[in-house]
Every structure is written in C-alpha cells, then in structure tokens.
Amino acid sequence: MKKIASSAKQFVICVKNDGYAVSLEKRKIYAALADATAARHGLMRVVDESGEDYLYPKKFFVPVALPFSARRAVMKAA
C-alpha cells in the first residue's frame, strides 16, 4: 500500500459512502489532500481503501483534528 504523502494536511471521517461502499468505509479516518479545484466543485481528494487518492463528494466527510501522536501513528500505519 502507498504511504500517505506529507502533503496530507487534513484527516477526515467518512460519514456517508452511497455508491462507494467498496472504496470508503463509514466511521473510518482518511487522509485528505489539498485540491483547490476539487473543492470549488464540492469534491474532496481522499486517499481511499486502494491506497490511491480519488475525488469524492465533500459531504461524505467531516474534518477531524487529531493530536500530534495520533496523527503520526495514522500516517505511519498507512
């Protein structure tokens, strides 16, 4: 599986996965990558179950602030 790039500045929790049940698990933490163009279209670039980043509807996720130790552990586990 691909390591999460250090450019992953935000973590999000999946709250909806309609049509993407294979790629996204509800209640799971994912890394979100900055993508201004996607954001303008209501999308978010997320590293999904495949280990690759794809665009998903922004409404599928809520941002989460992780303590530094948790953030480091999540990035290391990816």
Locate predicted features:
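Residue-level detector of intrinsically disordered, flexible termini
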Residues: I4-S7, A31, S69, K76-A77
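Conserved functional hotspots at enzyme active or ligand-binding sites that engage polyanionic ligands
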Residues: M1-K3, V47-E49, A78
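Basic/aromatic-rich interaction segments and small domains that mediate binding to polyanionic partners
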Residues: I13-E25, I29-Y56
